[in-house]
């Protein structure tokens, strides 16, 4: 539908890379990132993150894709700049830290004011409208992402929906950019105002957090009364209104998105009477307390933590639920050792990192893991996990 466009992705994390590679099948894409190591890997057709499809596409597909640390080179000729920088939740202000997004917007406005900026970073409700008014510009479109870490490119190739936070001809053209690189056909597309698009992202993730919290609470109840959690979940989820998905018990919801998005939604609507959303946050804390108490009932001298990552197939442990378990166990004076091959150094959270898996298994009285692995099959009698379905 288009000629070849020049598209820059700012931020080479899983959101930026999955969008950049999607579009590099048909257009000229430059990935901008401040980390030279990431840029060097990408220019060598290697992925800096763990994502099977990203690794495969970089190494085997014909892509018009390169990376740079030079923002002037990245932005100066771009038709579109996709902003995918991190917006961590700031507990002090009860808001997302949007400074990285704002910095990109200012840089692009200075270097290439004609570029259309597409914000993929998760932002507070009302952010896009406010910054457009504040800077006196109109070339910003918010389009939320619904990607899983470790499967980000797959989710862009097979999207559940495409949401564009603007109702205009240029919004329709943007939707086509996301569609033309996808494998899935007949993708639902919804055009909304920017504020509604921002709310869609936060409410979607908050619902997922609620679902995780519900099945975790079901599991806590079942474990407390000696019931078979799996049988209960199977029976509940045969109801098509409930569905057999996102129902595997865990140590709590975690990862990069669900904790911060739920808290941001609470902050956005703190003036609105609510019980459910605040209860989700409380339920997640309660789950971690429950898991910790179950572990401590075994009276271990040494608790071994197998992997910090939140999901299998991911290389990220930001806000992983097991971190909260570690803190609680250590507060009780119990020694914790950790096996996490992704971390360099000798300690994490002031707990020793054990490099050799066999030695780790031998030292631990009980091994806890959020998600099971075949590596633990030989010591399954001392493993504690609530992973019933072997999925995320």
Curated annotation (Swiss-Prot):
Its EC number is 1.1.1.22. NAD(+) binds at residues 6-23, 33, 38, 87, 122, 149, 256, 260, 318. Disulfide bonds: none annotated. It is an enzyme of class 1 (oxidoreductase). Keywords: Capsule biogenesis/degradation, NAD, Oxidoreductase, Phosphoprotein. Pfam families: UDPG_MGDP_dh, UDPG_MGDP_dh_C, UDPG_MGDP_dh_N. Substrate binds at residues 145-149, 201, 205, 246-250, 254, 311. The keyword Cytoplasm does not apply. The active site is at 257 (nucleophile). Phosphorylated on a tyrosine residue. It results in a significant increase of the dehydrogenase activity. GO terms for biological process: capsule polysaccharide biosynthetic process; UDP-glucuronate biosynthetic process. One of its GO terms (molecular function) is NAD binding. Pathway: Nucleotide-sugar biosynthesis; UDP-alpha-D-glucuronate biosynthesis; UDP-alpha-D-glucuronate from UDP-alpha-D-glucose: step 1/1; Capsule biogenesis; capsule polysaccharide biosynthesis. The keyword Lipid biosynthesis does not apply. InterPro entries: 6-PGluconate_DH-like_C_sf (IPR008927), 6PGD_dom2 (IPR013328), NAD(P)-bd_dom_sf (IPR036291), UDP-Glc/GDP-Man (IPR017476), UDP-Glc/GDP-Man_DH_C (IPR014027), UDP-Glc/GDP-Man_DH_C_sf (IPR036220), UDP-Glc/GDP-Man_DH_dimer (IPR014026), UDP-Glc/GDP-Man_DH_N (IPR001732). It catalyses: UDP-alpha-D-glucose + 2 NAD(+) + H2O = UDP-alpha-D-glucuronate + 2 NADH + 3 H(+). Belongs to the UDP-glucose/GDP-mannose dehydrogenase family. Catalyzes the formation of UDP-glucuronic acid which is required for K5 capsule synthesis. This is UDP-glucose 6-dehydrogenase. It comes from Escherichia coli. The gene is kfiD.
